[in-house]
């Protein structure tokens, strides 16, 4: 029973960590990353369609993304979607490829992005702590129902805390890496 709670806790914390990585990867650094354009929706036959379903996005070099549209008739719609996104990008088309140069980040913008990254990290930590609280509540319930002893309860809570500490440390490492990436480029 306790092992199931620990396993479930670890799986949920891993999902929180993956969600954090996903959120942070969308925050623009000076380096061109195809995931930067993942959130862009293109008007396609009257409905908003994710860009990655209509085009292939690759990093051409450190500061340029190349978007190869599958259907030539969509080039202007894709270009417009990138231009009107809140990413502040200025695409230019050349044949079937749209080049998206990334402007260098200003010092002020880097600091703003670091604040955003720290906020995302704090959300990740809160999520992990909430998962810990849920696990501890389940363990306390088992002890109240006399399914486990007080010693088993304490040991299980210590184990849950160790798992929590590991994941909080992983969040801190992810944040430190992203901050370094933002300041170095």
Curated annotation (Swiss-Prot):
Entry GO MF terms: ribosomal large subunit binding
Keywords, sorted A to Z: Cytoplasm, Protein biosynthesis
Any single Gene Ontology cellular-component annotation: cytosol
Principal subcellular localization: cytoplasm
One Pfam family named in its UniProt record: RRF
Protein biosynthesis as UniProt keyword: yes
Recorded superkingdom: Bacteria
Annotated SUPFAM superfamilies: Ribosome recycling factor, RRF
InterPro entries: Ribosome_recyc_fac, Ribosome_recyc_fac_dom, RRF_sf
Location(s) in or outside the cell: Cytoplasm
A biological-process GO annotation: cytoplasmic translational termination
UniProt-listed NCBIfam families: frr
PANTHER family: MITOCHONDRIAL RIBOSOME RECYCLING FACTOR PSEUDO 1, RIBOSOME RECYCLING FACTOR
Family per similarity comment: Belongs to the RRF family.
Role noted for this protein: Responsible for the release of ribosomes from messenger RNA at the termination of protein biosynthesis. May increase the efficiency of translation by recycling ribosomes from one round of translation to another.
Name of protein: Ribosome-recycling factor
Name of the gene this protein is made from: frr
